UniProtKB/Swiss-Prot annotation:
Origin organism lineage: Eukaryota, Fungi, Dikarya, Ascomycota, Pezizomycotina
Annotated EC: 1.-.-.-
Listed name of the protein: Oxidoreductase GME11365
Keywords: Copper, Metal-binding, Oxidoreductase, Repeat
Plastocyanin-like domain sequence ranges: 72-188, 198-331, 431-571
Domain of life: Eukaryota
Length: 613
């Protein structure tokens, strides 16, 4: 019944979008002035006159409905040869690939079949959810969780194209396995012959993520056991000494290359902690996309891939076979100052399907020691579709900087506290799964009556205005007695929901008013690495009413409060939610979840301890 209802209301909602945002939304083009096939020699063209030059925030192709059905469950599997309790999607890890074309409508029905009393909700990472904030999948912000036995339907338009991923946003649930790739086919800024299956890089743990939460808040971050590529890895163990060691040593993911062909790789970090150095022996990358933003191609032999970041690269199969026809795919933590006991060799490029020998391992100096954890220079990430950043409308003094730190909890003035939580902009976020922000705004008719714990920043500005934010990772103890905030060494991958942001500047040390912003078509993406001890200066345009989370995508940091939410154009939120017809379902889900939580979770002691997101 809900399926047909959503279909019936879709055009009404699109019409409402157009009435609110006539300059930002137009109906898809229906004719072409020139026809070129999208193929190996014409990847810049799509269909019906659309191309890599089309502004995808203004025009999108007509599309079809693509539909998926997900069942979320738990089981013991051994992706690296060691039995681990994993949260699965359709009995798979990683979950099934969502595949669509630019302009399609994607419908995913998610059934919670968990037996551990946990709820769930799913986020479609990088999807703007333009005017569909209620489908963003963040418990306590855009929805209540779905309780065990419940089903939720997510339906949204693929207005962007490229590579993304989906994951549970229910606390630390995705660290336990609930994640998978999203591929939205569209034009490309460089030609290629073969589109390879997406590559999910995952740092992996052998115990339940929720059991590690207390280690995180007591300054003892748990280091992953190793790395998986597309759900495969190698863990050396002895089955005679450990019954959970069932198929040692596991296996590595293998990619077949055709000599002379150009292969498109879609690299996705679905990690929870590690920022990866990623390279392939004997091959270069032509980078063509960052997150969901197509860019001017540039060539490199290594990428730093932060948690939740994505890159599309073209790799030409032109290697020399001096040491054989197999080559290692490498991935390891980027910070040499924090050694990890991982094998960098996470996969294999294979030219000859009959050759199953291990590749040659080059000398240590070829592993890019000392390369660091910095994103590619923003000047290398030039978007194909240009944007000029306008003047900021929000306050922009040092008091407005979003500073990251740790503070004692629950008493911030207690230097001897054994518990510390992350702080962003003087707040440690804690949301209430039973009373999401979006629902509160609808009930209160757009009034922003939020608590400090909900970490709101209200953006009540006109459509088209720009807002600027500096995020600093080098916070010092300005009040060391009353507000001590030590900063451990860490990259922070900062992710914004509902928008791509422009990167105006990114650097080491303290942000200074003398830093000159790049306002002329700067790099854009949805996840940026805040350098260790550095800063990043971002901007985005007001055009998408809703409650949008911004958080560090290190799962442990977000769980310990390193997040906030932007309340964008609060007065326009209720009309959009009401026009969508989603409100009765929202109310029903919150009623069911609250009853489940109060009657099941609380008596069992399975209560929310972390931020909730």
């Amino acid at each position: 019944m809900l399926f047909s209802f959503l279909q019936e209301t879709a055009y009404a909602v699109y019409g409402l979008w157009a009435s609110f945002y006539p300059s930002l939304y137009q109906r898809p083009l229906s004719s072409s002035t020139r026809h070129l096939d999208h193929g190996p020699d014409n990847r810049g063209y799509w269909k019906d006159g659309f191309s890599i030059k089309t502004d995808y925030e203004v025009e999108i192709p007509e599309g079809k409905l693509v539909e998926y059905f997900f069942t979320i469950s738990e089981a013991e599997i051994a992706p690296d040869g060691y039995l681990t309790n994993v949260t699965l999607v359709n009995d798979q890890f990683p979950g099934p690939k969502i595949e669509a074309d630019w302009g399609d409508t994607i419908r995913v029905t998610v059934y919670n079949n968990l037996t551990n009393s946990n709820g769930t909700s799913f986020h479609w990472h990088g999807i703007r959810q333009f005017q569909t904030n209620y489908l963003d999948g963040v418990p306590g912000v855009t929805q209540c969780p779905s309780k065990p036995g419940d089903t939720q339907v997510y339906e949204f338009r693929a207005m962007q194209y490229g590579t993304g991923w989906y994951h549970s946003h229910y606390s630390l649930q995705y660290t336990n396995g609930a994640r998978g790739p999203v591929v939205i086919h569209g034009p490309s800024s460089a030609n290629y012959d073969i589109d390879v299956e997406p590559l999910l890089i995952t740092d992996w743990y052998h115990a339940d993520a929720f059991s590690y939460f207390h280690e995180e808040i007591t300054d003892h971050a748990h280091i992953p056991t190793g790395t998986l590529l597309n759900g495969k890895g190698v863990y050396e163990c002895d089955p005679t000494k450990d019954s959970r060691c069932v198929s040692p040593p596991g296996e590595r993911h293998t990619i077949q290359f055709e000599p002379g062909k150009k292969h498109k790789l879609r690299i996705i970090s679905s990690a929870s902690l590690a920022t990866y150095k990623f390279w392939i022996d004997g091959h270069n990358f032509t980078v063509i996309s960052t997150d969901f933003v197509p860019i001017e191609p540039y060539v490199t032999d290594i990428l730093i891939v932060g948690v939740a970041q994505r890159y599309e690269v073209i790799v030409e199969a032109n290697a020399t076979f001096e040491h054989g026809s197999n080559f290692w795919i490498h991935g390891t933590h980027c910070d040499d100052m924090i050694p990890v006991p991982w094998d960098t060799r996470i996969g294999i490029i294979q030219y000859d399907a009959e050759d199953n020998s291990d590749p040659y391992t080059p000398p240590l100096e070829t592993t890019h020691p000392g390369y660091g954890c910095r994103d590619p220079p923003p000047t290398s990430l030039v978007p194909i579709v240009p944007r000029q950043v306008g003047n900021n409308v929000n306050g922009f003094s040092p008091a407005d900087y979003l500073e990251i730190g740790l503070q004692s909890w629950p008493n911030i003035s207690d230097p001897d506290s054994t518990i510390r939580k992350w702080v962003l902009a003087n707040r440690t976020q804690y949301v209430d799964w039973r009373e999401p922000s979006l629902r509160k705004l609808v009930h209160d008719n757009g009034k922003t009556n939020f608590t400090q714990d909900e970490a709101p920043i209200v953006l009540d500005y006109e459509t088209g205005e720009w807002v600027y934010f500096v995020i600093e990772g080098n916070f010092t103890m300005r009040d060391p007695i009353n507000d001590p905030r030590p900063i451990p060494r860490s990259v922070h991958p900062i992710h914004l929901h509902g928008h791509d942001f422009a990167i105006l500047a990114q650097g080491d040390g303290y942000f200074s008013k003398d830093v000159v912003p790049n306002l002329d078509n700067p790099a854009r993406r949805d996840t940026v690495n805040l350098p260790i001890g550095g800063y990043v200066w971002i901007a985005f345009q007001i055009n998408n009413p809703g409650t949008w989370l911004m958080h560090c995508h290190i799962a442990w940091h977000a769980s310990a409060g390193l997040s906030l939410q932007f309340i964008e154009q609060p007065s326009k939120i209720k009309p959009l939610v009401e026009a969508s017809g989603i409100l009765p379902e929202m109310e029903s889900r919150c009623k069911d979840w609250t009853e489940h939580y109060n009657k099941v979770n609380i008596p069992l002691g399975l209560v929310q301890e972390d931020s909730g997101i």
